[in-house]
């Protein structure tokens, strides 16, 4: 199956593997538009070239009726940001920006309103902010840095809703428990697994299923560190949710069984992640307490005051000279 165009409402995206093939598609598309009395807006039409790994980038030159189209590094299609490099860095920043903007617009009418219960505010947050933040996350291939950025924004919003200040010294695990939310990692992996099961149940002729289970006919992966693939992310999610990667397709064939496996796996993964975070926090606290207990300190010879650092002792000695 060769995919040449992606159509949705009045949006159209053309795909080609070579520059001359793309120019041919654009010429054919422009001719078809003329036959139906349509006009292509060259100011809204952009070109993006994604070279294969190891191949130098060159700016494409695509024209419509003699007018060259603007080449861009990234563009937005159906709400998602597509970049020239195979990374979701810009998409994650875009998601955080849109969710932050939505959170700010609701501050006066929802978050700061005393007449609205906290439970209702959390439902609004889940329906508006969280869906904006994780829009199209089913198709992401996230790295840990992306999940950390999303999780930090998630916790900032929950602390603001629950009126928890940083001076209260309440850990993130307790904030999530009070709000009744899971971590961003669990939410993203849960969405990916649900989407994977939906694709697995599609007929074999459907394009999403062919893309998920297909293999490249040409080319090979470079030597050394490899870029993370969607299949790699999906396999990690299955292992985290205690789902066998070898037999997941049989489980996903039955929708109710697959949903139950995902829900149970999410609870297990969240409990393990919570226990690990609590254990790390206790270890960090114990190391700090033991270091403070065994530290010799710096004693003032004048009054016997103990200072934690030498610079503190020097500053304190100045008070005796005045």
Q: How would you label these PLM feature ranges?
A:
Residues 1-322:
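Short linear motifs embedded in intrinsically disordered, charge-biased segments
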């Amino acid at each position: 199956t060769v995919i040449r165009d992606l159509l949705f409402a009045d949006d159209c995206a053309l795909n080609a593997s070579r520059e001359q093939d793309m120019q041919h598609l654009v010429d054919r598309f422009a001719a078809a538009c003329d036959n139906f009395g349509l006009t292509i807006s060259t100011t809204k039409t952009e070109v993006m070239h994604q070279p294969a790994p190891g191949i130098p980038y060159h700016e494409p030159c695509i024209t419509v009726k003699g007018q060259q189209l603007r080449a861009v590094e990234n563009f937005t299609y159906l709400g998602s940001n597509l970049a020239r490099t195979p990374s979701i860095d810009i998409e994650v920043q875009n998601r955080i920006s849109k969710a932050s903007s939505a959170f700010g617009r609701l501050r006066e009418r929802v978050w700061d309103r005393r007449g609205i219960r906290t439970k209702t505010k959390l439902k609004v947050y889940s329906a508006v902010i969280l869906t904006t933040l994780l829009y199209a996350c089913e198709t992401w291939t996230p790295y840990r840095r992306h999940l950390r950025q999303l999780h930090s924004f998630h916790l900032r919003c929950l602390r603001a809703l629950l009126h928890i200040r940083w001076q209260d010294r309440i850990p993130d695990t307790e904030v999530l428990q009070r709000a009744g939310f899971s971590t961003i990692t669990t939410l993203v992996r849960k969405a990916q697994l649900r989407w994977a099961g939906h694709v697995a149940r599609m007929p074999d002729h459907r394009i999403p299923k062919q893309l998920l289970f297909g293999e490249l006919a040409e080319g090979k992966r470079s030597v050394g560190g490899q870029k993370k693939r969607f299949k790699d992310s999906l396999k990690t999610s299955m292992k985290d949710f205690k789902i066998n990667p070898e037999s997941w397709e049989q489980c996903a064939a039955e929708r109710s069984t697959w949903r139950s496996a995902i829900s149970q796996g999410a609870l297990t993964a969240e409990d393990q992640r919570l226990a690990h975070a609590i254990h790390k926090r206790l270890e960090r606290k114990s190391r700090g307490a033991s270091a403070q207990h065994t530290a010799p300190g710096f004693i003032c010879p004048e009054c016997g005051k103990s200072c934690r650092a030498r610079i503190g002792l020097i500053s304190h000695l100045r008070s005796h000279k005045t």
